[in-house]
């Protein structure tokens, strides 16, 4: 899979960091400069595809390694399946997030394999943390951070505000069905009646894929085109992935739009 770099094994902190930067540069190249080529290679009709970055700053879209367990940690599997069900920028952001996780896993795999002690691991993480993440580069947040450079106090404040906004967005999402939380000490008759009505309505909801009834402990998502509800598992959408989707189209609607 590594193509000429399969036997390359960095053994020092500096070598591992150099390996990290090379792989990171390749992935950024795929998600920015070569984005059209990358988009075309991630055909949803193909099998589970992964985005690989190599130490020589080359990227590749390919099937996962056949050997089990693989020689190195594997990147996110099946990035091509969500391509046509999301806006392109949201899909690229999702791939970037998973790529960041993969880059860290590869670096600390080398750290564990070659016995880095606590000081080495801390130094490696500090070196990695000094460069913007792939996600920050792809979304443009890296440039904003270099311009703003907020103080640590402001960073903590912004982090709290960001978390509160995320909670607000999750509670207001129109795409997912969540079981309502019971609020202790607040028993309003009108609220209880509304909850009963919602439960009756959701109980009659059928999955557009498998035809099963709605259950409160399952994740569901609604198609913005046909307005049908689907089990997340039936359409291969997770709650984490749904957060990045602004306008979801089910597989049937996606195929209809793709036809000439």
Curated annotation (Swiss-Prot):
Enumerate composition-biased segments (Acidic residues): 182-202
Site Histone H3K4me3 binding — annotated at 214, 220, 224, 229
Residue positions where N-acetylmethionine is found in the record: 1
PHD-type Zn finger ranges = 204-256
Where are the annotated segments for Disordered? 142-203
Q: Which UniProt keywords apply?
A: Acetylation, Chromatin regulator, Metal-binding, Nucleus, Transcription, Transcription regulation, Zinc, Zinc-finger
What CDD domains would the database entry show? PHD_AL_plant
- Where along the chain is composition biased (Polar residues)? 148-165
Q: Name one GO cellular component term.
A: nucleus
Compositionally biased intervals (Basic and acidic residues): 167-181
Disulphide-bonded residues: none
What the entry lists under Gene3D superfamilies is as follows:
Zinc/RING finger domain, C3HC4 (zinc finger)
Summarize the subunit comment: Interacts with H3K4me3 and to a lesser extent with H3K4me2.
What's this protein's function?
A: Histone-binding component that specifically recognizes H3 tails trimethylated on 'Lys-4' (H3K4me3), which mark transcription start sites of virtually all active genes.
What family is it from? Belongs to the Alfin family.
This protein's name:
PHD finger protein ALFIN-LIKE 5
Q: Which organism is it from?
A: Arabidopsis thaliana
Q: Which gene encodes it?
A: AL5
